[in-house]
């Protein structure tokens, strides 16, 4: 049975993330790995800015399950290495960032770009290719505005290309607005959500709690004795 058949939708604030989706620029149907909000503590109050859903290709379960099967949701949540494996895994991923509060494209792209460049420079891996990819990333967001309920859509191919799309409602367009061929940038977009310093601990926890039982189920059929 495919993973897509065994997962459920998730609600974050007033937004529903369906159990499966066909991302922009993709021919595949991905399943909902997890979802959660991104927010900040401001003057003693937790303000939620965006709801984020992370979708994965079915093959991710077997890919990751080889190493992580048998681990509890808590163990996965606390493992930096686990989320790194999700980010770098050779399977398709899709991220939907839905606005709870309004945001301009410029605000969003500048924040993501600053974080990416700072990390790359600290690791000594910031080259001309990354500089050009960041320029393209900022350009596509330049004239965009995102009212509540609108979404930014990121499709990350197994080869590492990043397709960026936008939606003003719950629909998902067939194609993206731009494709950026830079694996480092593609991975960093997901890393910024679920990595070591990811902006959505809730999405990380959700991902771990939903994938843990799927890992334990994977391979169950192949382990049965042949009749």
Swiss-Prot record:
It catalyses: a chalcone = a flavanone. InterPro entries: CFI, Chalcone_isomerase, Chalcone_isomerase_3-sand, Chalcone_isomerase_bundle_sf, Chalcone_isomerase_sf. Substrate binds at residues 50, 115, 192. It is an enzyme of class 5 (isomerase). Fibers. Keywords: Flavonoid biosynthesis, Isomerase. One of its GO terms (cellular component) is plant-type vacuole membrane. It comes from the Eukaryota. Pfam families: Chalcone. The record marks 108 as: Important for catalytic activity. One of its GO terms (molecular function) is chalcone isomerase activity. Pathway: Secondary metabolite biosynthesis; flavonoid biosynthesis. Its EC number is 5.5.1.6. Belongs to the chalcone isomerase family. Catalyzes the intramolecular cyclization of bicyclic chalcones into tricyclic (S)-flavanones. Responsible for the isomerization of 4,2',4',6'-tetrahydroxychalcone (also termed chalcone) into naringenin. Part of the biosynthetic pathway for all classes of flavonoids, a large class of secondary plant metabolites, many of which are brightly colored. This is Chalcone--flavanone isomerase. It comes from Gossypium hirsutum (Upland cotton).
């Amino acid at each position: 049975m495919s993973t897509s058949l065994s997962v459920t939708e998730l609600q974050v604030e007033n937004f529903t993330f369906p159990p499966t989706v066909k991302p922009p620029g993709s021919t595949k149907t991905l399943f909902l790995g997890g979802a959660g909000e991104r927010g900040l503590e401001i003057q003693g109050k937790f303000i939620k800015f965006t709801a984020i859903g992370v979708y994965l290709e079915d093959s991710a379960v077997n890919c990751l399950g080889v190493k992580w099967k048998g681990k509890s949701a808590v163990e996965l949540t606390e493992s930096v290495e686990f989320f790194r494996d999700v980010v770098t895994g050779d399977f398709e991923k899709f991220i939907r960032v839905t606005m709870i509060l309004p945001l301009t494209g410029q605000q969003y792209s500048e924040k993501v770009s600053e974080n990416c460049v700072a990390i790359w420079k600290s690791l000594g891996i910031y080259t001309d290719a990354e500089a050009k990819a960041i320029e393209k990333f900022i350009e596509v967001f330049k004239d965009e505005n995102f009212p509540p309920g609108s979404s930014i859509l990121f499709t990350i191919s197994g080869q590492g290309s990043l397709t960026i799309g936008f939606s003003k409602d719950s629909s998902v367009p067939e194609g993206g607005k731009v494709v950026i061929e830079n694996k480092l940038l593609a991975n960093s977009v997901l890393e910024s959500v679920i990595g070591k310093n990811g902006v959505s601990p809730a999405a990380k926890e959700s991902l771990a709690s939903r994938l843990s039982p799927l890992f334990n189920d994977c391979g169950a059929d192949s382990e049965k004795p042949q009749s």
